[in-house]
């Protein structure tokens, strides 16, 4: 199908837009896509001179083709048309030199790897984890008992990946936390801040550097109050000097003995008076074989700003990094050859380790002294923490501020300032220790065993495929517009905060709810929840035009046809904007208001009509050219004729407009005043506050026009999806109407939220609220008998594994077993949450869906999973010229779907059907035949081992299971419902009441006894003058059972009990 648009009124050339045919050359098509790589410098200079020689410095579609052919750059008609539309961004069908060069620049920008590094979410986006420190006093030291070193030999350094397979938080992989306080108490914690054990020791601060392989000597660096730095080197082989020696559980040694060589395993080295003040931080880099030491110089009168805040020592050569007030903390990133410093002057400085004279960048923004800095080299981010507990995140290359995190001020008391920080590079966690332990995730890795990653930072609302640039555009509720290359999985362009609104001085992002392309697919139109509309040149993220419907009314659907833009939403009417040069900034045209509720969806049939549907189930068909309605239906009673009648509010508004117009007719300024009065009346119309009553309406979730079906009475050309799970089919003919409906879901409460078809309307693709993707074969559905064609089921079974027979009829097939048409050819669960948008790419046969679970996924038409846009995993190479999916390829399942997938979903996504028993001619199954073969082989092996056959019984006397009953019990399952209740198939036998035995006499006597008969109270009196409690013997109570020997013995025992409580009373006092 091709659509022809005239280039302009004055030109005779026409631009023909059509999709790619499969017969085109891949190499030639690739050349047009990569023109910025194929063109040379000499050719570019000749092109520039050709543009200068033109009369108006711009050329048309034919002139540009002649200029390119003179430089041996040739294309066929289809490819050249696509190339011209990409270059002509002004839509005037004239190309100047600036447009041509801009197209070449955009080609280089798409390949910029820095665009792939921009994160969708803030580096610190998760809530912190807080727990008690279990120390009596505040924690003064925090360290990590590492299992693996952060420093890796250069020959073992590989490309860092931003995902993990789980298990990295185990103690064997991530190590244990160690906290110490001033009272000499040490506690060991897991990576999840769970206590392990407690020990007593003295707190001390050191720095330790080692390799995992043990081939390089480990370094223990010590700094003291006098500015001295000592390095203790030893070999970690066989635990080095820390080997256990018999008879010596503890070895005490002083530094002087180590210098004398009494312990030969140690190799000491001293740097006396390296600093003039107390050493604040030390580090030894094994990559550069360099020692870093820093100190604070707060006495400005003494040092006058010429203090060596940090010193790097390499082979007895010192490099001084002079920083005013010195350095409190630093971080060395060996992979980038940089060091980041922070000190009391509130500045964060980035240095090249080989250029100590001047920093590469100075990051400003803190209001307090810097107490911690660390770098994530793989993410190109710098984190800094100041004395006021404010965390700032910076971009390492751009030197810009990315985030300011201030939740520590809320979690920690303002009087608690002496905190200890430690960054775990393996888990990417920042741990803050004081009277509490707080763990903060800093740009955590993606767990690929749980998810494939996210496409957006919020639910995806719209996904579109651009046939001109061959890319996917996704819009989300996070107010992001992202352009993806589906063939390589790369992210080309990301536009953040596309729709914004200022509330109380703060800029708030507005969700994008609708989007579409212009007829030539050069520009993007988006609608937001606040009623705003924007036209984007999304190749360079420039807003071309701003529009709006009624304020604070959500835009639910947008339609862009030739010279017109239609927008509708919660304002209950269609708003038409001009798209003609010179008239685009006029007042929009409001179509008549026939709807009585919010419009939820709409669609267009090019050249014929528009259909709109509301939340209350109203459907209205409109003429596209005139904007007049011609049919109206209700989905609750689709066969009933409903008169087209304006709402009471609309009739009142029209009467007021006519009355006002008649008054202004007698005045001189008729036209000017009528226009002003009309606009003021539109703005001051009252809101429609109607009462819907107690009946809950059936809302319409999605509508779809079949573009290839004609406007006749017998052709079902409009599909209406209801929230009950049914899809109704209508004819948009003036005398047409409701035709039929079918059930499109198989779970109670589910419904279809989005629909699309292929270019020839052979298949219908639906996405449901429960995350299911269904494919329907609609070639013979709602068409006249003369147009129905034969359905080749074997061919469909080869493509759709869902149609292949199974041992038991699955739930999706049971739901549609009584529906002859349309034919359900595929059904599987693609997302955990609702699917908000679905689209289809014709030539490679790819379905892509946008869901409420923040992801946009690609599938083959048969249901195989291709990938998630934005994933950190390698992308399977695709091409727009060949069909996606190879039957010989083993397909992977999304990790989140794998845990909840049914047997049908597992079969469709994996492309593998479980083996079932198949009957053969002799009446035995394949499994029985294989078992008999195995038994025959066992008997043959026994005969080889034994000379004579073994006499029966071989195993002696043993228990034998009873034989089966002669009568075969046939179970009939009740399949009338969507599920089978198992308990209805169970045989339940009635129970009889058990005979109650008489109660024994001993038990009866014990039940009638009263413990008060054996209780003798004790009367006590406290002597205030003394320190003991004097208990006096009570008088004997006369009882009938006083002669009992048990009571006498008890009383006698009480008389001999010593009653001395003085010691206990004294201890308690």
Swiss-Prot record:
Polar residues biased stretches: 664-674
UniProt keyword list: Repeat, WD repeat
Coiled coil: none
Tissue and organ expression note: Strongly expressed in testis and weakly in the soma.
Per-repeat ranges for WD: 155-199, 322-361, 365-404, 455-494, 507-546, 594-634, 747-786, 830-869
Annotated protein name in UniProt: WD repeat-containing protein on Y chromosome
Stretches the record annotates as Disordered: 664-688, 1033-1069
Note: Chromosome mapping suggests that WDY is fully contained in the kl-1 region, and WDY may correspond to this fertility factor.
SMART domains reported for this sequence: WD40
SUPFAM superfamilies in alphabetical order: EF-hand (SSF47473), Quinoprotein alcohol dehydrogenase-like (SSF50998), WD40 repeat-like (SSF50978)
